[in-house]
């Protein structure tokens, strides 16, 4: 007797004109209908099958419920003729208007509002089963949504049969209000979901759920063969400690839920109780912001990658836009190929270069040559000369600078008139040479065969190996270079003679060694042609020669300064501008000045005042 009753109840649920509503017996009906007599007879024999499936074992009720046929209630007029009613197993009627349907989403999905959310779960009935049969607007098949509350919080969606089984936990009995999405003007058509035993299951508690989706159900047929892409959005607010714990607990639970032997992708979705997830070709999420505002439907299409990797899709709670299936995927960011820079150190030929700073410290720079095959892949590093000649370097800094300079190729030096001289390390000889100090533009390096050229490639200076003790090369013109080289070679002692250091190599000093008288009146003369100036001290002669060559060996070591000077006293006077030292004081007015000539000029003002 229970089978005819269930079939009749299903027939009444589908028909919009005739349906049943449970109510108590009234005295207005004089004669009971045949359906009422049949229900009364079944109640005498035993409890109905519908109530036996819904209610748990409980004490028998004294009075049975009677089903009385009533007239259908008038339905309100709607702009479209797509409204229908839903009859639950408990007799509650849910009316869905055509204006609440939205079928503009890809895949034929539509969202409707349930006006009676209290039917989802009851605290007293943990095993209650509510089944809704919703016919499609266009199509032969129907979608069945079955909600089964139990102790575990699981949502199982079966796209093959268009069934969604929801089993919320008994701890939270909050209804889920769903407001209709804004109606979009489009044709009301639905497309069936792909058939097959593709199971989509959500497990976990709290506000975090783990979605396990088969890859063959998530791949769009139009994007087969394209690159794997994934849409990732970060939530605006951080998760609480309870949510993090719930997420950690929900991950291992979802692993045994997959029983099919196929490639499965795990997607972690951070959602709340107000979100409804519907699986198919696309991932549909309905978000209700609250405050009387309409709900927003967000549709995300997940395309799995080629390799077996776990991808994460995070959807923010305040998302107020609808992501269409065509624009859901984002282009992948092209990655630059890795560049390998290799410096081959086999068979090294290091060359030591000694650099003496104006303060007297000696720095050792090791320049290591690499084979020509690796020279093309090794980047060239340019080093500035003031950094190489920075004074007051500790032992550790010397080692660090030497290690860095091993990778450098050109060592440019500041030449006179502002030009740059490139000292190529490839031209340095690897064999051990005689230790010799050569002063090239104020930088003293080891005497090895090098060729110094300017930026234009013109050869300006060639230094040869000589056995002299100290050799000073300060000229850049060919005549000056040849003159100084001849002087150095002429001053070199013979193998059998005793060598001594020469303080000055000017013509007067060379000729004065052979003369015996008037040594006190000897003057140092400039050897530059058409000059002929004489000086009392060799230091003054050297400073004068720097004016001809343009050499400025004295460099200011203050940050962001780097000014160069010909004489050391000029550098000391310039350093007072940085320190603010005013060592010259007027004896009459106690004013202080940085330079002595400024004090002399100021002192003349006092003499002029006294004369008046």
Swiss-Prot record:
Record keywords: Activator, DNA-binding, Metal-binding, Nucleus, Phosphoprotein, Repeat, Transcription, Transcription regulation, Zinc, Zinc-finger
Domain of life: Eukaryota
Gene Ontology biological-process entries: circulatory system development; embryonic organ development; fibroblast proliferation; in utero embryonic development; multicellular organism growth
Biased composition (Polar residues): 184-195
GO CC aspect terms: nucleus
Modified residues (Phosphoserine): 78
Any one GO molecular function term: zinc ion binding
Start and end residues of each stretch annotated as Disordered: 166-195, 226-250
Principal localisation: nucleus
Pfam families found in the cross-reference section: zf-C2H2
Described purpose of this protein according to its UniProt entry: Binds to GC box promoters elements and selectively activates mRNA synthesis from genes that contain functional recognition sites.
Free-text domain note: The 9aaTAD motif is a transactivation domain present in a large number of yeast and animal transcription factors. In SP2, the motif is inactive.
Family stated for the protein in its record: Belongs to the Sp1 C2H2-type zinc-finger protein family.
Protein name, entry field: Transcription factor Sp2
Gene: Sp2
